[in-house]
Amino acid sequence: MLMTASQQDQHAKMYLADIHRALRIPSPIPSTDYECSDYASTIASISRESTMRNFNRSNISSTAPSFAESEDAEDGDSFPYDQTLSNSSSFDDHQSLLPFSTEVRRTPTYSVMNETDSSSTSVEDVNKENILSLNDSCLIKLSDDEASNKSSRSSTPRNSIKSNSSNQGHGDIPIPKKNPARSVCNSKLFNEDTLPAEFEEVSISPPVKLELPTHSHNSSDTSFTNSIVSSVSDMVGLGEGINSIASFGFSEDSSSFQDIKTPPRLSFADENRENCRTDIYRSDSIHEYEEPLTSSITSLDSPHVLDENAPIPLLPKVVSLPDPRFTNVLSAFDALTRTYLLRQNSKVVHATSQKQEMQTSRRVVNSCYMPESLSRNLSSSLQQTGGSGRLFVRLMEIRNLTIPLASGMTTRFTYTISGKHIQVPWNALHSTTKIENEYTFDESISSSIVCTLRAAYDPPKVRTRSTLGKVFSTNKRKSMTTDPVSEALHGFVSEDGTFGEVTINTDSVSRTALGRCQSMVLPIMNKWTVDPAAKDVKPLPRKVGELEIHVFFLPALPVSLKELPASIESAMYDLKLAEWDRTLLCDGYLCQQGGDCPYWRRRYFQLIGSKLVAFQQFSKVRRATIDLSEATHIVDDNHYSDEEELEGYLYFESGFRIIFSNGDYIDFYAETVGEKDEWMSTLRQHLGQCSMVHKNWTKSFLSLSF
């Protein structure tokens, strides 16, 4: 049954539409984004164009020209992408082929798989008579000489290889592979006995069979399946290799309806090996006799114009890693497109010429943290000054004293501090007794300071008798005389009346009380309590009370001892002033004349403690700093207007003047009267504190700790 022209046109359009749908597959090129990836978009477009031309060369009966039949075929050509490394024009030497054309120009280049038997190209589901009639009506007939040559060559079994029937599955399609070690299946394509002698000389690696995933078409769509299968079968018979997704290292779970295979036009080795690319990376797994892959532009210069309305298949982003067996294929792409290689470390490496152990960023001392930077600055300052700073210790009160005291009698006590030659008057001792005495330690401080508490205690004495009394005395027990206070303390104190000791760890205090007042409660330990009922028992230390103290530590600073504070209160007051000196009090726009401004200039000002800082009006760049510690007066311009006018001075209703101790002055005026009043009230409120801020020891201390 002959097909009409409209049916033929419709059938051709359906065939091309199926080809376009088949081309929408994940690309074997490992690419991400064409604009910023390692592979240029031109290669992908050339690959699609080449694949379209290869399909367009096949007629309805799926007869396509062999890649090995072209004059430009080189040794190991597998990719039609490389246009720069080819030495000959690609398509000019071939005769122009129309779609569904079977006329092919034969070249002298020898190819084993250059012909296919007419019986192997038939399709069982398609009527052979319809196909032949369609070819007779649409295509150019072969000449008599070429037809006779073709029939003679096809009848020779040594020069042709019959492909499998077109209705077999893709898993049975035999495919010649470049490297059999990398093939999925290493079964031979045909028996070695049927090979010609010429083929044994040319071919190095034996052809193998590649198992391909099946299509996901419906069972009812037989026309498309049979046409594609017959086309693939004929291409195999002509030496056209099939490149699948699996062959490039992709998993089978990524195959779908679009997993139609595109022919990359494989060829066997050629005698002309000087055109082979030698700059491609050779893997160690490649055999020594295997030649590297080369490129050909056989189908790039085709005059055939693709349909502009046809959708161009996009290459999606490939997230899986490539198969390491095809490293040479990926290296070929790198050699074509890569211009530079960027390597970036994901870890930070710290290099040093000194061998030292890594220390933690914080050091724990009695559950109190001290920044390591401050600790280093403190240790360096101690080495430079050769001192240990100043330690303030204030004894506040004695709490919860448990030693027995005589009722109705006053027990007095005193204390001594190691390293201090002090004489403390006797004071009354109770269970809670206030002391409130402060002491400073300027010289080198030992690791601990011991405070010893001592009570007024008289040990018992034996009454002695005269000589005459001894003669006339009886054998009575000698009596002892003691006062009630000493009698109550007997057995709880030492012979000199010491009833407790308090130990202050200076190493701990120097870190916990650095630059601040630290309140501590320390135990009072007694080492002289003895049980009267027990005999020859060594006394054990026991807690008999608590002592509350306040400590404050200043590190060694490059200032004289006279400049250091004399007490904890003065040190805390100076530090509060230093903290206030860093506080923002007022800000806004003012016009200034004087100082660094010989004429009126509008600036943005900030009153930070005792400093009036000027910034640029727009960029807010710091321009000048006015120290108000030497300022003595803040004068309103309205006050000057009532008195004698100054020569050359311009008075403003919203202006004021700052006068310094050396007679200099700077004039300001605000944008409104309300802003002027706010500035003047803030300046007058804090002007008295500005003169007390600048202490040398606070500057030195803050430079160490902040």
Swiss-Prot record:
Residues 81-90, 149-169 have a biased composition (Polar residues). One of its GO terms (cellular component) is medial cortex septin ring. Keywords: Cell cycle, Cell division, Cytoplasm, Cytoskeleton, Mitosis, Phosphoprotein. Residues 62-102, 145-180 are annotated as: Disordered. The modification Phosphoserine is found at S379. Residues 583-688 form the PH domain. One of its GO terms (molecular function) is GTP binding. Belongs to the BUD4 family. The gene is mid2. The keyword Cell division applies. It comes from Schizosaccharomyces pombe (strain 972 / ATCC 24843). Responsible for the proper stability and function of septins during cytokinesis. Required for the correct formation of the medial septin ring structure in mitosis and for the proper localization of endo-glucanases agn1 and eng1, which are needed for efficient cell separation. May act as a landmark for the localization of hydrolytic proteins to the medial region. GO terms for biological process: cell division; septin ring organization. Its main location: cytoplasm. InterPro entries: Bud4 (IPR052007), PH-like_dom_sf (IPR011993), PH_domain (IPR001849). Transmembrane segments: none annotated. Disulfide bonds: none annotated. This is Septin ring organizing protein mid2. PROSITE patterns: PH_DOMAIN. CDD domains: PH_Bud4.
